[in-house]
């Protein structure tokens, strides 16, 4: 029990000391400096005025902010139990690597004479672009699919914005985004290791992806703040500014259906959801139908589950009473898609929890996947049984019996 408490406290403190996390102390200090500098340049505000706006008690100790702090504490405990049971990106990367071996009947070696830094640059850029595009797709789905909105709504009920608002998420949304990161990283790692081998490296600064480091150090934490900073009409067509994300959090639903991107604005431009920042910030943040219990922690965790069940149930009952057999409305379609997404997430979670052993068939040389196997075993504690050789399929069937997917 004592070890669990120490581990929990370590997880709570880690985001402030880890450059891979948004609220790393260095990024928070950088955000203050950016806010002071740009506020003076763009609007002539003094350092004292900007600091007063940044650290106003009415923002940092509001009901909304206090709920954020509670959610951080609760979600951390929840995710400590869930994350080790999710499918590993190393396992998925290994599966993809082996699958590509079969597709290509061997492993090509692309650009054998290319400098290592070129391969590292291409890999880092590809991973960043894929990750950012996936964030846009998932974020837009959370808004467009009513079932998923039941959970994402928790984030948008924030009426005051602080850097900790980024963690104001329901655990179901947390699992969805965790799986998104796992799949995207596994895709990039598997493909690049297949084509470029051990030349695949990530360009980092202080251990963080170089692109995300620059994003965070240049004021990413101001996205969830009351400091209005616009990049101008030209730059905002390429990068999402803090002001654009604050527009996304506006209480006006027309604003909330825009600027779904995380870093790059190109996805919103392609999807028709880009909105440039205007001269004035939104009048208020949150959602229009906020209730007195909006910032109650029990309500934050329970209400989305109730609403999700209702979201699934109501279209079905309406269909029986009113709709012809062949008529499905758009809301039902979206809820069905959302249900499938949730089913996949829970299925992956359930499979990971139930799997004490992982059985892998490989007709390739052991050294090709052994590093992935060892890393996966060290990270998850899962025992891995690997069958090598051409007759491995028969051995696999014999070992796994009737439960074998083969």
Predicted segments with their positions:
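Short, strongly hydrophobic alpha-helical membrane anchors
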Residues: 1-19
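A membrane-cytosol interface segment of integral membrane proteins
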Residues: 206, 281-322
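Bacterial N-terminal signal peptides that target proteins for export
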Residues: 326-340
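Specific transmembrane helices
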Residues: 23-105, 123-135
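Membrane-embedded catalytic scaffold of the fatty acid hydroxylase/desaturase
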Residues: 74-88, 92, 96-97, 105, ...
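A transmembrane-helix-recognition feature enriched in membrane-embedded lipid enzymes
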Residues: 65, 72, 262-270, 301-315
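Early extracytoplasmic/lumenal segment of secretory-pathway proteins
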Residues: 355-406
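Bacterial N-terminal signal peptides
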Residues: 338-349
């Amino acid at each position: 029990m004592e070890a669990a408490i120490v581990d929990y406290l370590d997880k709570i403190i880690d985001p402030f000391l880890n450059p891979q996390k948004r609220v790393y102390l260095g990024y928070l200090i950088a955000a203050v400096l950016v806010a002071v500098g740009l506020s003076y340049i763009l609007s002539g505000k003094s350092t004292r005025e900007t600091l007063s706006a940044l650290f106003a008690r009415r923002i940092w100790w509001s009901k909304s902010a206090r709920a954020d702090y509670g959610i951080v504490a609760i979600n951390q405990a929840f995710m400590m139990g869930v994350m080790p049971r999710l499918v590993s990106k190393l396992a998925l990367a290994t599966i993809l690597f082996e699958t590509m071996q079969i597709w290509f009947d061997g492993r090509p070696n692309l650009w054998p004479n290319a400098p290592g830094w070129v391969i590292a640059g291409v890999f880092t850029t590809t991973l960043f672009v894929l990750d950012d595009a996936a964030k846009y797709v998932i974020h837009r789905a959370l808004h467009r699919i009513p079932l998923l909105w039941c959970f994402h709504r928790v984030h948008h009920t924030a009426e005051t914005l602080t850097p900790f608002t980024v963690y104001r998420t329901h655990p179901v949304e947390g699992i969805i985004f965790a799986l998104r990161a796992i799949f995207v990283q596994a895709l990039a790692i598997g493909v690049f290791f297949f084509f470029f081998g051990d030349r695949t490296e990530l360009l980092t600064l202080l251990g963080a992806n170089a692109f995300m480091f620059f994003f965070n150090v240049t004021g990413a934490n101001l996205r969830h703040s009351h400091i209005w900073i616009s990049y101008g009409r030209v730059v905002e067509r390429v990068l999402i500014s803090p002001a654009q994300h604050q527009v996304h959090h506006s209480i006006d639903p027309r604003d909330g259906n825009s600027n779904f991107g995380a870093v790059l604005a190109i996805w919103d431009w392609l999807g028709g959801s880009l909105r440039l920042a205007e001269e004035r910030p939104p009048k208020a943040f949150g959602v229009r139908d906020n209730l007195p219990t909006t910032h109650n922690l029990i309500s934050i965790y329970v209400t989305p589950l109730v609403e999700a069940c209702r979201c699934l149930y109501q279209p079905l009952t309406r269909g029986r009473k009113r709709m012809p057999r062949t008529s499905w409305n758009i809301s039902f379609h979206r809820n069905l898609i959302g249900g499938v997404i949730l089913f996949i997430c829970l299925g992956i979670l359930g499979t990971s929890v139930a799997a004490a052993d992982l059985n892998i068939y490989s007709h390739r040389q052991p050294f090709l996947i052994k590093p992935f196997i060892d890393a996966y075993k060290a990270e998850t504690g899962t025992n891995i049984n690997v069958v090598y050789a051409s007759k491995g399929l028969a051995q696999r069937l014999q070992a796994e019996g009737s439960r074998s997917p083969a």
